[in-house]
Each structure stands twice: as C-alpha cells, then as structure tokens.
C-alpha cells in the first residue's frame, strides 16, 4: 500500500488492521474472514503482529524475558533469543539482560520490538517505519532480514517506510488518495512514480498467497 504524503493515514490504517483504532465504516477481512469486530487479543491469536512507530518501554522486564513472552508456548533457548536480536542488528550479549526501559535509545527499543515480532512467527507482521532511529549498519541488517522473510514466503509483511531499499521488496503497491484507490500494481509499475516524486512516503505490502 502507498499513500501520497505524511498525514495521509498510513499509521491509522495499520492500527485499524491491528484493532488499535476502530474504523468509522467498512469491514476488515483477513484470510477471507471478517475480523472487524475482533479485539486486539483475538487478532493477535490469529497471527497478526504490530510494530509501533514509537514502541512502548517495559521497566522491570528484561529483553530476554520479553522475547520469551513474545514466543508464547514455544520454548526459546538463549541461542534462539540471541539469533532474533542479531537479525535486527543488535549484539545479543549486550542486550539480553538489560531492561526495556529509558536507558535504551528509541532505535534500540524499536529493534527489540521487531525481534519480539520475529519470535512470534506471525502470519501477518505490520511494521511502522522500522528504519526510524536506526543506524545504517543496523538498517542494512534489518533489510536483509526482511528480504529473507520475503524470500521464504511464509509470512505477509506490511511495512510503512520511506526507504527505497524496503519499498523495492514489495510484491504489490496500492496508492490511496482521498480515501480512494488511485493506483494499484506491482513494484515495477508504481515505483517509478515514487522516484519521480509524484508520490510520497508509503507503507509496503510483501505478501504470501493468503489475502488480506
């Protein structure tokens, strides 16, 4: 999906999908099921995860404990927890025992949140500007992780991003203007419009066969 500019409703739409915001009209279908009336918890149980633009902090909870909590019934070994942190560009040994509190930068908290989403093995992962506040090396590592998920084809990703490298991963881009679909097509068709600065920042969908 792609919107014309900042303030166009990218984050609002993502939150509606997750159930954080209620739609004023219309319905939300996920894998052919109407989930409009489902709670956040019910949507999460169906395999939908959401990464905030500004993730919350959890004083008193360590990164290790948060990853274990995210994994649910799956018993994560310490090595598995470390691997998820590595995928988002963090040195695991430096973070596992740290609390998710104000001592961490915004970029660090964002990457930790992304790691928890990876640990959940969600069917639908929604990321709101995952590159915000992240250094170039970590961004490259994170992009490699997104590319790997995309290639495996086991999950759908909706990524709100202004970064060309992430946008190019999209299978399909839908441009919405004034509440209507203005353009819809594959990346090769729509991406030149972005390069020409005809359109603004965009959420990107990378999807498997399951429809949203």
Locate predicted features:
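Helix-to-loop junction immediately C-terminal to a conserved catalytic motif
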Residues: 18
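Conserved ABC transporter NBD signature motif
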Residues: 26-33, 46, 80
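ABC ATPase NBD coupling module
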Residues: 34-49, 194
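Q-loop/switch helix immediately C-terminal to the Walker
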Residues: 54, 60-77
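Hydrophobic anchor residue at the start of the ABC signature
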Residues: 113-114
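ABC ATPase C-loop
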Residues: 117-118
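Walker B catalytic motif
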Residues: 129-130
């Amino acid at each position: 999906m792609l919107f014309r500019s900042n303030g166009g409703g990218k984050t609002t739409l993502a939150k509606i999908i997750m159930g954080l915001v209620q739609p004023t009209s219309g319905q939300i279908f996920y894998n052919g099921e109407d989930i409009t009336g489902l709670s956040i918890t019910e949507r999460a149980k169906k395999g939908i995860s959401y990464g905030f633009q500004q993730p919350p902090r959890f004083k008193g909870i360590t990164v290790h404990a948060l990853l274990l909590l995210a994994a649910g019934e799956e018993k994560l070994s310490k090595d598995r927890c470390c691997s998820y942190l590595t995928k988002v560009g963090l040195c695991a040994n430096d973070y596992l025992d740290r609390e998710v509190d104000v001592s961490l930068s915004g970029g660090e908290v964002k990457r930790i949140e992304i790691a928890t989403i990876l640990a959940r093995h969600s069917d639908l992962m929604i990321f709101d500007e995952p590159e915000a506040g992240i250094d170039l090396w970590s961004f490259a590592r994170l992009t490699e992780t997104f590319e790997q998920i995309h290639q495996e084809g086991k999950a759908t990703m909706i990524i709100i991003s202004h970064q060309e490298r992430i946008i190019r991963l999209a299978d399909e881009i839908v441009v919405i203007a004034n509440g209507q679909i203005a353009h819809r097509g594959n990346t090769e068709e729509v991406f030149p419009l972005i390069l020409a600065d005809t359109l603004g920042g965009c959420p990107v969908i990378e999807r498997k066969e399951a429809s949203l």
